[in-house]
Amino acid sequence: SQFLDPDGTFPNHIPNPDNKEAMESIKNQVLAVGADYGVIFDTDVDRAAVVTGDGELLNRNNLIAVLSVIAISEHPGTTIVTNSPTTEHLKRFITELGGHQYRYISGYRNVINKAIELNKAGTDCQLAIETSGHAAFKENYFLDDGAYVVAKILMLLPRLLERGETLDYLIKQLVQPKEVVEVRFKIETEDFKTYGNEVIKEFPQWIPQDWVVNPENEEGVRIDFKGEYGDGWLLLRMSLHEPLLVLQIENDLVG
């Protein structure tokens, strides 16, 4: 265990499974002591992430992939609701498992509410999860419960062992982007929402002709691209809580 002395100033790192420094800290400790796995929570344990014995980080898209394996194996054909900035590789991963991904607007409560709504409308949805680490299973009353998430992963391990597989093997089936970039543009005007939404509306007018607006998107504008600029996507959206435009880009080509 690390950092057992309570200190509300969090002097070691931000207690956040979506934070690079926090994940690097637990990864280094797992590798240093030769642990089988490492587990990290946020302060109120509604978010979690895992590090494998080989140092593979199971957060963000990787965590969604692992939990999707669990949900789809237990409920074939189920739908996984995620927030919008997830990779196209993840969508293909879920589809190849026999499941469906429903990308929705950011905010863990938005994702959970959409899953509840889909179930009421007759679409089986067993998992709602954000890249931030908030994950909620239908069987657990759609509570975002980090401890429950870790328990589900631990229960997956014997099934993997029977097949001669590990979490490391499992996550290697998910293609990883070569480059990931996030840029936050501050909107310095009083009516920032109107301004930001106008930028998003006009943005597709300025993209190259061979880039494509992805219709399966409910937040901001998502663009898919291939060719000389690589193979990837970008998402331009408003921040949930701040006067910011958030641009997220993933590419299978570095640079």
Q: Model-found features: residue ranges?
A:
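N-terminal small/polar loop signature for handling phosphorylated ligands or for N-terminal nucleophile
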Residues: 1-51
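Short, acidic/turn-prone active-site loops that include or flank metal/cofactor-
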Residues: 3-7, 62-65, 105-110
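Short, charged, surface-exposed secondary-structure boundary motifs
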Residues: 8-14, 69-71, 111-116
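Short, solvent-exposed loop/turn segments at secondary-structure boundaries
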Residues: 14, 54, 139-142
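Generic hydrophobic alpha-helical segments
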Residues: 22, 26-30, 68, 111-115
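Phosphate-binding and adjacent anionic-ligand microenvironments
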Residues: 37, 75-255
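Short Gly/Thr/Asp-enriched flexible loops that form oxyanion-binding sites at enzyme active sites
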Residues: 46-66, 90-91
